[in-house]
Amino acid sequence: MPITQNYGTGRRKSSTARVFLRKGSGNISVNGRPLDEFFGRETARMIVRQPLELTKNVSNFDILITATGGGTTGQAGAIRLGIARALVEYDTSLKPELRKAGFMTRDPREVERKKVGLHKARRATQFSKR
């Protein structure tokens, strides 16, 4: 019997997540480690589970995730988008619900580049009137 799986790619900031959705009992593993071990912060784990909780599929799928680049917040956001896209590939009727919650939208915010002559992207040297 072939393994049927659904795939979704998610990106946020400089992070990328490849999500593979398979029928199962609710195991989520990120880079070969369980979700609770990979993300130390509860908020990151909550972000990852949001699309599953919204569609009431928490214990219906086993999810295999490969996350690269960026930090924990970026990776959590990328995984959330990837899971949402994989769920839509599995069942298209979930799309309006996920879109309404904002899980289908790629967050376009990126780090602004540092400019020449400034300390950071916008931070300039202190201005002295006299």
From Swiss-Prot:
Gene3D superfamilies membership: 3.30.230.10
Superkingdom to which the source organism belongs: Bacteria
A cellular component term, taken from the record's GO annotations: cytosolic small ribosomal subunit
Keyword Ribosomal protein listed: yes
GO molecular function, one term: RNA binding
GO biological process, one term: translation
Coiled coil, from the record: none
Alphabetic keyword roster: Ribonucleoprotein, Ribosomal protein
Region annotation (Disordered) ranges: 111-130
Compositionally biased region (Basic residues): 116-130
Xref: InterPro entries: Ribosomal_Su5_D2-typ_SF (IPR020568), Ribosomal_uS9 (IPR000754), Ribosomal_uS9_bac/plastid (IPR023035), Ribosomal_uS9_CS (IPR020574), Ribsml_uS5_D2-typ_fold_subgr (IPR014721)
Cross-referenced HAMAP family: Ribosomal_uS9_B
PANTHER family: RIBOSOMAL PROTEIN S9 (PTHR21569), SMALL RIBOSOMAL SUBUNIT PROTEIN US9M (PTHR21569:SF1)
Family statement drawn from the similarity comment of this UniProt entry: Belongs to the universal ribosomal protein uS9 family.
Protein name as catalogued: Small ribosomal subunit protein uS9
Organism annotation: Xylella fastidiosa (strain Temecula1 / ATCC 700964)
